[in-house]
Amino acid sequence: MTRRILIIDDEEDIREVAGLSLETVAGWEVVLADSGAQGLARAAEHQPDAILLDVMMPGMDGPTTFRELRKNPITSHIPVILLTAKVQSTDQKRFADLGVEAVLFKPFDPLTLSTQISAELGWE
């Protein structure tokens, strides 16, 4: 089954590396967004199987974007994995309290990114 993943990250390099990894290694369809607002629109339009969401973005950050996704009945069911460069113990609790499916860390290994996502979401 071909999966569709939405990657929401303000860093072009991260979007490109993650997108290329998921397309070539896993054969998944990838949709890209460079901001929380664009991500909300693309999530509603493309109905991805999961969303990889950066925590630190200008404007609408990852946690705010996540809450907005959950408010919309069209996107409220989509699993979300946060992507972050740094996590302190207070952040881990905050992310767990949000209700995200998982948190992955930058830098990630492009060769194992799809395996990590599949494991976190029980797609194996």
Each model region followed by its residue ranges:
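C-terminal output helix
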Residues: 108-117
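Acidic, metal-coordinating helix/loop segments flanking the phosphotransfer/catalytic sites
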Residues: 32-50
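Receiver (REC) domain active-site loop signature in two-component systems and cognate sites
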Residues: 57
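His-Asp phosphorelay/catalytic-motif detector in bacterial-type signaling
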Residues: 47-49, 74-79
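Two-component/phosphorelay signaling modules centered on CheY-like receiver
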Residues: 12-31
